[in-house]
Amino acid sequence: MSIAHIGLADGREQGEDRSPERTPPHDLLAEQSALGGMLLSKDAVADVVEVVRGTDFYIPKHEIVYDAILSLYSHGEPTDVITVTDELTKLGELSRAGGAEYLHTLTSLVPTAANAGYYANIVAEKALLRRLVEAGTRITQMGYKAEGEVLDLVNNAQAEIYSVTGTQEVEDYVPLTEAVTVAIDEIEASKHKDGSMTGVPTGFTELDELTNGLHPGQMIIVAARPALGKSTLALDFARAAAIKHDLPTIFFSLEMGRSEIAMRLLSAEATVPLQHMRKGTVDNRDWTTIAATRGRINDAPLYIDDSPNMTLVEIRAKCRRLKQRVGLKMVIIDYLQLMTSGKRVESRQQEVSEFSRALKLLAKELQVPVIALSQLNRGPEQRADKLPALSDLRESGSIEQDADVVVLLHRESAYEKDNPRAGEADLIVAKHRNGPTKTVKVAFQGMYSRFADMAPI
């Protein structure tokens, strides 16, 4: 076996440049031509701004010219050489932009503005390559420094790669005026929706009215004692998002297998008793219903992952991929205490606290609601009314702190067989960072593996 085969060779092809300094990827002519087109036509400006940002230009003066054009365009002003020259002069940037003569040079390089969008794509691709090179350099440095836990380094490396093609880069800080503008835009958008939902629907009318749906960046905790229906409720949320509203959702199951999940989904959607499916005692009419339901839900964008011993690093990596591939809208994890970090920790409480914080950060990074199921300790069973409380969240107080919404699931009939509220459940919204708390009464239809809105009286 040669040195090259075991990875000890230099790795460069013969004749490849061994110079430590290389010019980052860029295309000077494409940058000039895109700007030239923008100076010739407002239509070209619209084409270019869809694919290029100022930071995508490699040549500093090109970014200055682009920003000046964009400023004029956003105010409805002409974007020709004369107006851009005037704008740059007012800003004191004309000399840094190459002067008026350079602006005329840009327009002379392109006979027509028709291809500006094509040139802009080249500029954007080169910028993407530069970000990839920069990310690779940072990952290499992380590997050589080897500071911290290996799995943390792997996660940071994945985040670097995700940032190359992921969400639009933003500054760590923004002025108040920008934050207020975003808030006003959201209020305006809500106004035009005529009171309809702005977040991901849960499928429960009263809960949706309370929360206005589950919102991007939120971490939602659904907690209960064992065998009260946490997984069933989580699947109801998944059904509402993916099947009823076509919103890409991933369900990480660390407890049930994929076939069990699929069977529960079919039972809930087809209204065929789950026990009949398990025993194989479905009749012909039920088979017809199941077949029709399968055809209806087959193409729903619901993704199920039942990988055993799943680590937080793996969950993050899979969510990032789905965000890029299908525009992921919601993440569900069943359940928090079954997750593993894959590394040594001082205590289980510390580990669960890290999971909680990391999931909140994941929700903010991907701008999706993340629903995490959690076990409650034995606190409710020691109370006369058996009602759960926030203090019952198991193994970590940080879960309550990190969560935007905490829903405590309670069924009186689980403790008393002859309870008059058999077939009912309470969704106790014990924490709601952006709104009021409330107890939402729902119907528990255990034979169909689902919760549902209470029937109107």
From Swiss-Prot:
Keywords: ATP-binding, DNA replication, DNA-binding, Helicase, Hydrolase, Isomerase, Nucleotide-binding, Primosome. It holds the Pfam family DnaB_C. GO terms for biological process: DNA replication, synthesis of primer. ATP binds at residues 224-231. Residues 1-26 are annotated as: Disordered. Gene3D superfamilies: DNAb Helicase, Chain A, P-loop containing nucleotide triphosphate hydrolases. CDD domains: DnaB_C. This is Replicative DNA helicase DnaB. It comes from Leifsonia xyli subsp. xyli (strain CTCB07). The lineage of its organism: Bacteria, Bacillati, Actinomycetota, Actinomycetes, Micrococcales.
